[in-house]
A protein has these predicted regions:
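Conserved pre-motif I regulatory segment
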Residues: 232-279
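Signature of the SF2 helicase/ATPase Hel1-core->accessory helical subdomain module
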Residues: 292, 298, 318, 326, ...
Length: 926
């Protein structure tokens, strides 16, 4: 029965682009018989339009190569003969199918299967589903990526390997996958054509029972520490772990003693022993993670006390838990009790997932693949943690249907309670003595409690983000899209009201209440939309949002509240508030009237949660309208292509630090704040003052990077442009373009250019792509050419690349070696003073008689600048240059603050042309 799936043709096409009218420039076919590639067919194709530069760079197919190639019409008949009578395989088949049928001018009768979908199903945790990534994972050679014949052969080999591996899975799991995908039984597919659904049933038939059955697997396997097994070290002599002849040296052949690492550990030891807080800057290469994990583990064991470690990013959280902690447990000779804590929505709800699988067959093809892939994932990984999955944008939306959520949770009454992924995670955290979490969950716990187990010592890594995260977590946001969704659930027959009526069979009893609630919910929806449109239109007009701007923010100041036009906005908001209040009251009355019938227990929880969220939105809207709390800044936010659905009304603390000090530093015995960038001009006073820390309550330590910056790095600053303050945005952008055109060939690519705005980034990319002298370089842009991770992969794939990045690219980019040899700072990263929170904080500082620029704007920019420059040297062997195109570091009195905050290294200042010559020679030095 499997034979028909071992005879097929794999196809790949290279094209002039990704648009609907893109032309094929190469086609490759791999003919498979009895599970082996028996012959191939390939041809270049001459397109009617020229091949774009970026396509030529990616594929290696130039206009010269296809000049004498046949047109599609000349190879069409032979192509059709080769594929005749076969089903076709491609990677992301809709693209190849679409391009071929576009060239043919008609549809093909052949069945199609997708190797991408097969990989999604059987490799659900793969980090990338590019063909080359799948091939690498399966140990299949891929010698000429982005050439059609090579990719067709690799595609065939990937499919065959996945099919062979699938046969070794538990037949029960395969059968569950088939039923989830199809929603039908095998007999209906006995004579079907080739399809993914049919293939799943055939694989279940052919599978051997080599894996344990799904229901025999343990869902919860906590890691308990043996209390009688002592670690190899005591807390008091933890620094011995890093000694020249210590434990780490014996376990790592490339070990190098780092004095800054030991200094950092000593500071943490003192803070723990004396119940003090600490501010610790640890430069790149210090070994920061081990420096705080070792004392945390030993302290938690010896004192039977919990230590929480919070990171700014999920990536670091995962690294600590899945890489660093297992290594240290082995090194220290003790299975310390550790756990990872994440937000509830990160975990799979088994009850919702079970229901989702039963109805998945009626969903779209993409959603069916998603649901089916999770059947295998959960059979192999019972943590239910979505971080182990690689979800795209659409799949993230699907996940919301199966994620653990308070509004749908039945608690102990749930039939899956004992296996619950979320509660198992909570139980592990309660048993653990070292808990790894993230800033977001840390502050949610500080705000509402009960999310993390009790603790009195915390280590916060990536602490330069702490103020922003605290501000975000304590911001109240009126979300008009959310209000519409909540109201919509009560406004239609298919929503909550209809489901209650069906479940209880009390149509007559509920009819009157249902009609009243539906009418009031509809009225609230109408009034809310009207209010959103009124405010959104005003913001757009007031800010005159530029064509390339993404966000429009309007700070609602006292001056605006006293203006005539505000009265119109306020009345519109009040009308919406009254309508929502009326709807909330009616919903509450209905909830009070419903008995706790077990038939609607889950539904009642959903309705109650929706009511509570709607009431919360109503209360926040009331606060926003009143605007009487001077400790808050109020603003409205909308996005490009405004609609009522993307309007947000926000209220945030102007100065969040008193609350942070109360919730964190006053409540905990020890809070360690660490980062590569806490100091300004090699001084921690700015950070200490920001967090309201008094000299006697904290320790401090600045641990410089052990890397040799003086010999491996330099700073280049062009000095042949006008003073920045005398330059328009248009002229400055033109200067950046001109400078990059000269500098990119000089350093031969391998460059990251950091921007503070997408508007400038987009203009620069277009100009560089149009520059003939840069034809040999791939110019990629954040927001234009793929996700952050895919762009970083491209930077390291060996091609000469210039990556233009904004926002997130200023930090967290860890590219070692020759793939990144130049970092360019296009503009100093000052936060725009018109941003609502920044504006309000500056106003507060001015009212206190302080200089807002030196007290706030400058130090924040310096820390951001240091983060950006820190992308360059990531290892002892790295070598490269930092180019600063913003001449304010030379012309302004505060410019030295930026330069003096960097590690000591040569600084070159000259014309762009001269710098280009010097950098070319320097890069070519051994």
């Amino acid at each position: 029965m499997m034979k028909k799936y071992t005879n097929f043709v794999a196809i790949d096409v290279e094209t002039t682009g990704l648009n609907d009218d893109s032309e094929i420039i190469e086609v490759g076919l791999a003919i498979v018989e009895d599970g082996a590639v028996v012959r191939t067919w390939q041809s270049l194709v001459r397109p009617e339009k020229p091949i774009p530069k970026d396509i030529a760079i990616m594929t290696g197919i130039s206009n010269e190569m296809v000049a004498d190639a046949p047109a599609w019409s000349e190879i069409e008949d032979e192509f059709l003969q080769v594929i005749d009578g076969h089903w076709l395989l491609a990677h992301n088949y809709l693209f190849d199918k679409g391009r071929v049928e576009f060239q043919l001018g008609r549809s093909l009768p052949n069945d199609w299967l997708d190797s991408h979908d097969m990989a999604k199903l059987f490799l659900p945790t793969l980090s990338s589903y590019k063909l080359v990534s799948i091939a690498t994972h399966l140990h299949i050679p891929d010698t000429n990526h982005h050439r059609a014949l090579n990719d067709a052969v690799v595609c065939a080999q990937v499919f065959l390997k996945l099919m062979d591996d699938a046969k070794q899975l538990d037949p029960f799991v395969l059968h569950e996958m088939a039923v989830t995908y199809n929603g039908q039984q095998e007999s209906l597919f006995a004579n079907s054509s080739c399809s993914l659904g049919d293939l799943l049933f055939r694989l279940a038939e052919a599978a051997t029972a080599s894996a344990p059955a799904l229901d025999s697997l343990d869902f919860f396997e906590p890691s308990y520490a043996d209390p009688y097994e002592m670690p190899r070290l005591r807390f008091a002599n933890a620094e011995a772990f890093f000694a020249q002849d210590g434990i780490l040296a014996k376990m790592k052949p490339d070990f190098q003693y780092r004095a800054p690492q030991v200094d950092m550990l000593d500071c943490i030891k003192q803070a723990f022993a004396t119940d003090k807080h600490a501010l610790i800057e640890a430069g790149t290469g210090t070994g920061k993670s081990f420096a705080y994990l070792v004392p945390a583990l030993l302290w938690s064991f010896e004192h039977d006390a919990r230590v929480v470690i919070a990171t700014g990013t999920i990536n670091l959280q995962e690294q600590l838990f899945h890489t660093d902690l297992p290594f240290l447990k082995e090194a220290l000779g003790h299975p310390f009790a550790t756990a990872i804590a994440k937000g509830r929505s990160n975990y799979l709800c088994l009850r919702r997932f079970s229901e989702y699988c039963r109805r998945a067959s009626t969903a779209s093809e993409r959603e069916r693949v998603f649901a089916t892939s999770l059947v295998l994932w959960h059979a192999q990984d019972h943590s239910g943690d979505r971080e182990h999955l690689n979800l795209n944008k659409a799949e993230n939306q699907y996940w919301q249907n199966i994620a653990s959520a308070p509004d749908t949770c039945l608690g102990r009454r749930c039939p899956f309670y004992n296996e619950c992924c979320y509660f198992n995670s909570k139980r592990q955290c309660e048993q653990a003595r070292v808990v790894i979490t993230n800033h977001s969950l840390l502050f949610q716990d500080l705000k509402i409690g009960s999310l993390l187990p009790e603790y009195d010592r915390v280590i916060i890594d990536e602490a330069h983000h702490l103020e922003d995260e605290a501000t975000h977590q304590f911001t109240d946001t009126v979300d008009f899209e959310l209000m519409q969704k909540l109201l919509n659930n009560f406004s239609r027959n298919g929503g909550f009201l209809g489901r209650v009526t069906v479940a209880l069979g009390k149509a007559d009893t509920l009819a009157e209440n249902s009609t009243e609630i539906a009418e009031r919910a509809n009225r609230a929806m109408t009034d809310t939309v009207d209010a959103a449109k009124t405010i959104g239109g005003t913001i757009t007009f007031a800010n005159n949002i530029p064509e390339l701007s993404n966000i429009g923010d309007l700070r609602i100041t006292d001056k605006i509240r006293n203006s005539g036009w505000w009265l119109t906005l306020e009345e519109s908001l009040r009308k919406s508030h009254r309508a929502v209040t009326t709807a909330v009251t009616s919903i509450r009355r209905l909830l009070n009237s419903l008995d706790e019938d077990e038939n609607i227990e889950s539904l009642l929880r959903e309705m109650t949660h929706a009511h509570d969220r709607l009431a919360e939105q109503r209360d926040w809207l009331e606060r926003f309208i009143a605007g009487i709390d001077d400790s808050f800044v109020y603003w409205a936010k909308t996005y490009k292509n405004f609609s009522y659905a993307n309007l947000l009304l926000n209220a945030a603390y102007i100065d969040i630090m008193p609350l942070v000090h109360e919730k964190l530093f006053e409540a905990k015995k020890t809070a360690i704040l660490t980062s590569a960038t806490l100091a300004v001009n090699k001084d921690l006073n700015y950070t200490a003052n920001k967090f309201l820390l008094e000299p006697g309550e904290y320790l401090s330590s600045i641990n410089e990077s052990p890397f040799d910056y003086e010999h491996h790095s330099l700073i280049a600053i062009p000095n042949d442009h006008k003073d920045y303050s005398k330059t328009s945005d248009f002229e400055y952008t033109r200067n950046v373009i001109s400078d990059l055109k000269a500098l990119i060939p000089a350093v031969d690519g391998d460059m990251l250019v950091l921007f503070t705005s997408y508007a400038m980034l987009n203009k620069v990319q277009q100009a560089l792509k149009d520059e003939p002298s840069l034809n040999g370089y791939r110019i990629l842009a954040h927001g234009q050419d793929g996700s952050r991770s895919s762009l970083l992969e491209a930077l390291q794939d060996g091609e000469k690349t210039v990556l233009l990045g904004a926002n997130s690219f200023w930090e967290g980019v860890d590219v070692k070696g020759a793939s990144l040899r130049t970092v360019v700072i296009a503009k100093l990263p000052f936060t725009p003073p018109t941003m609502p929170v920044e504006s309000a904080r500056n106003d507060l500082l001015k009212s206190q008689g302080k200089n807002a620029f030196t007290a706030n704007s400058l130090p924040q920019a310096v820390l951001r600048f240091r983060q950006g420059c820190g992308r360059l040297i990531r290892s002892n062997s790295d070598r490269g240059c930092i180019i600063i195109l913003d001449n304010r570091v030379l012309t302004k009195s505060y410019g030295r603050t930026f330069l003096d905050s960097l590690p000591k290294q040569p600084v070159w200042t000259d014309s762009v042309a001269t710098l280009a010559d010097k950098l070319k020679k320097w890069h070519n030095e051994p």
